[in-house]
Amino acid sequence: MEWHDEGIVLGTRRHGESSVILEAITAAHGRHLGLVRGGRSKRMQPVLQPGNRVDLTWRARLDEHLGLFQVEPLELNAARLLNSAVAIYGIQLLAAHLRLLPERDPHPGLFEALGVIAAHLDEPETAGVLVARFELAVLDALGFGLDLARCAVTGSREDLAYVSPKTGRAVTREAGAPWADKLLPLPTFLTAGNEALYDRAILSQAFALTGFFFARHVYEPRGLTEPEARAGFLAAVMRNLPEGESAP
């Protein structure tokens, strides 16, 4: 068995004296693990850092085996990301989200999204929005996607302001007004194609929204707790955002 693909490093763990087991999200083969011989060498350690884009060749006798990775660097982002608390927490959070998905289950859209985020993860004004949208995409990949395209009551695509905690569907400001205290606020930048301004309060609403559905559909049923990196990421982003509005 052999395949060739691009990947983004999620993490490694030590294996023996000189090797590591590499975990990467790939373009066509999903989240995949493999042994990298000599992965702890001075040459390979900088390559195998989280956030780096790499060229991967995987070989194994049988498909179900761990297999061996041959790794070549394509884009070394880690040195830049390690200088930012937002980026450090962010890459940990993104990796934790991807580990919720079945191993080797292809998600090319998430791979491409992660590549875009990695390029901006040390930019707090942009990173918060990108990660919030990524969380929506992960929920969708897990089968728990939210319907934010139109109002569940009226069918309107305009002035969507709330999300029903029961159905995960959007509701307009007018239709939701009588039940506003029971609905979740919907930040406008989460609706398709919307580039609305946002501030700390609005970004907090976005993460409260995605966090609610992660807890209900993923963490609680699986007996998991929210990744610690999530609170760390949000706090680091907030420290760099103004109180008023900021462009995404």
From Swiss-Prot:
Signal peptide: none annotated. Keywords: DNA damage, DNA recombination, DNA repair. InterPro entries: ARFGAP/RecO (IPR037278), DNA_rep/recomb_RecO_N (IPR022572), NA-bd_OB-fold (IPR012340), RecO (IPR003717), RecO_C (IPR042242). It holds the Pfam family RecO_N. Gene3D superfamilies: Nucleic acid-binding proteins (2.40.50.140), Recombination protein O, C-terminal domain (1.20.1440.120). PANTHER family: DNA REPAIR PROTEIN RECO (PTHR33991:SF1). This is DNA repair protein RecO. It comes from Chelativorans sp. (strain BNC1). The lineage of its organism: Bacteria, Pseudomonadati, Pseudomonadota, Alphaproteobacteria, Hyphomicrobiales.
